[in-house]
C-alpha cells in the first residue's frame, strides 16, 4: 500500500509540474501579431543586410578561387600575414 501511495504522489507531482510548465509556455509564446512584427524586424528582411551578405559571399568565393589557382598549401603556412611570395597580406 505504501508503494502505491508513493507512486501516486510521484505521478501527481510530475503531472503538476508538467501542467505548470504547459501553462507557463502558453503564457510566454508570442501571439500571431507579435510573430508577424518579429518576422518584419529580422535582419534577413533588410535589403542592406542582404546586399552585404551577397558581397561577403562574393569575396569569400573570389578568395577560394584565388587559393585554388595557386600551388601553395596554405594550411602549412607559418606566417598568415605574409602570402606565399613573401609579400605582406
Swiss-Prot record:
Annotated keywords: ATP synthesis, Membrane, Mitochondrion, Mitochondrion inner membrane, Transmembrane, Transmembrane helix
Q: Which Pfam families does the entry link to?
A: UQCC3 (PF15141)
UniProt membrane topology term? Single-pass membrane protein
Span-the-membrane segments of this chain are 8-28
Which InterPro entries would you find in this protein's record? Answer: UQCC3
On assembly, the entry states: Associates with the ubiquinol-cytochrome c reductase complex (mitochondrial respiratory chain complex III(CIII) or cytochrome b-c1 complex). Interacts with UQCC1. Forms a complex, named COMC, composed of UQCC1, UQCC2; UQCC3 and UQCC4; mediates MT-CYB hemylation and association with the first nuclear-encoded complex III subunit UQCRQ.
- Share the record's PTM remark: Probably cleaved by OMA1 under mitochondrial stress conditions.
**Name of the molecule in the record:** Ubiquinol-cytochrome-c reductase complex assembly factor 3
Q: Name one GO biological process term.
A: mitochondrial respiratory chain complex III assembly
**Region of interest: Mediates lipid-binding:** 23-80
Q: What organism does the record attribute this protein to? A: Mus musculus (Mouse)
The role this protein plays is:
Required for the assembly of the ubiquinol-cytochrome c reductase complex (mitochondrial respiratory chain complex III or cytochrome b-c1 complex), mediating cytochrome b recruitment and probably stabilization within the complex. Thereby, plays an important role in ATP production by mitochondria. Cardiolipin-binding protein, it may also control the cardiolipin composition of mitochondria membranes and their morphology.
Intracellular or extracellular location(s): Mitochondrion inner membrane
Membrane-side (Mitochondrial intermembrane) residue stretches: 29-89
Q: Which GO terms describe its cellular component?
A: cytosol; mitochondrial inner membrane; nucleoplasm
Provide Mitochondrial matrix-side residue ranges. 1-7
Amino acid at each position: 500500500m505504501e508503494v502505491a501511495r508513493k507512486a501516486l504522489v510521484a505521478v501527481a507531482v510530475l503531472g503538476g509540474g508538467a501542467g505548470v510548465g504547459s501553462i507557463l509556455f502558453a503564457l510566454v509564446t508570442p501571439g500571431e501579431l507579435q510573430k508577424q512584427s518579429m518576422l518584419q524586424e529580422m535582419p534577413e528582411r533588410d535589403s542592406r543586410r542582404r546586399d552585404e551578405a551577397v558581397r561577403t559571399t562574393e569575396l569569400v568565393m573570389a578568395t577560394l578561387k584565388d587559393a585554388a589557382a595557386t600551388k601553395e598549401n596554405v594550411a602549412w603556412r607559418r606566417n598568415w600575414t605574409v602570402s606565399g611570395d613573401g609579400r605582406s597580406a
